Amino acid sequence: MKSIKGLHFIIASFILTILTWMNTSPQFMIPGLALTSLSLTFILATRLPLLESWFHGLEKVYTVHKFTSFLSIILLIFHNFSMGGLWGSRLAAQFGNLAIYIFVSIILVAYLGKYIQYEAWRWIHRLVYLAYIFGLFHVYMMMGNRLLTFNLLSFLVGSYALLGLLAGFYIIFLYQKIGFPYLGKITNLKRLNHDTREIQIHLSRPFDYQSGQFAFLKIFQEGFESAPHPFSISGGHGQTLYFTVKNSGDHTKNIYDNLQVGSKVSVDRAYGHMIIEEGRENQVWIAGGIGITPFISYIREHPILDKQVHFYYSFRGEENAVYIDLLHDYAQKNPNFELHLVDSRKDAYLNFEQKEVPEHASVYMCGPLSMMKSLAK
């Protein structure tokens, strides 16, 4: 399992927490685990390259991030009920109760996220940091000298608390300012069909990436969210970078309808571990809809193909397909590139039960989650 280092990091954190609290204050095991889980939640949200490497992909980091945040809420609610509620005259209890209610409110907002504007959801989400600070006040005021004198417990709690505080501070106050070192502007826009647009960007310095990766893009144009959004890289070289964006929400609709040449942008770095270059000499590519983007990136970077590739591109109707001319041209110039176009309106859905997958081939898939789950069975 390629994400084994990341899982070891999470499991070791919880085991260390259990052993430390058992040897000192076992009655506080549940809130101790909640504190560790919350700290891990903030750490996992930093998008640090080391974490992405440990978990073999940012999407896996996000999956564990969701797990630790949900686990934190469950542990805090259980702690609240086991203590008979936290309302009381002591200030420490008040801090604890405030933290729990903010956390629960954020969870409700997370479930309602698709019904509110992303920018509003993002700012509400930041209240978690305030709740985390309240929670730390609660822990240190309740535990007193056990956490204020140097011992294994105080070292463990202090270390995770400090890492959580630093991670949260970085996410909220620093990431937007220092996390996007590649500045640039839009030099060309192309509408590929009725809902998909290609963006060409000229950056202030060369951008390193590998075909199959994605990056977070910030757009500085009136009427656009200030928050960064992830998009697959569809090509580029040196200071030129391409993104292909499908209209699938408020932000992407705004890009399709209103984005203008000359607008300033910034990019953080390349993410993702679907590195086509690292695959075997015999490969199978499977793309659905806008999932063709990472493969287009590879095609643009490798005009002469040095691998045997079977490429299956599935789309629903010719009006929804993109880059068809480019694919046909590439297939003509590269005999070892076998192109299979699958129009689900005419040919039904892509099915490999009757199709032969070459032995010892690297298989890469990108597209709708339902398609990938179906083909992975």
Regions found by a protein language model. Name each.
Residues G6-F9, S13, V64-I172, Q239, ...:
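FNR/FR-type flavoprotein reductase catalytic core
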Residues L48-P49, K114-Y115, I171-F180:
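Membrane-interface capping segments at transmembrane-helix boundaries
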Residues M1-F78:
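Membrane-anchoring hydrophobic segments
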Residues Q176-S266, Q308, F315-G317, H328, ...:
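Ferredoxin-reductase
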Residues S37-L38, I43-L44, F55-H56, V61, ...:
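Long, contiguous hydrophobic alpha-helical segments, chiefly transmembrane helices and signal peptides
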Residues L58-V61, N80-G88, R146-Y160, I178-L189, ...:
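Juxtamembrane/interfacial segments around transmembrane helices
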Residues G57, G235, I276-E278:
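Generic structural "secondary-structure junction" signal
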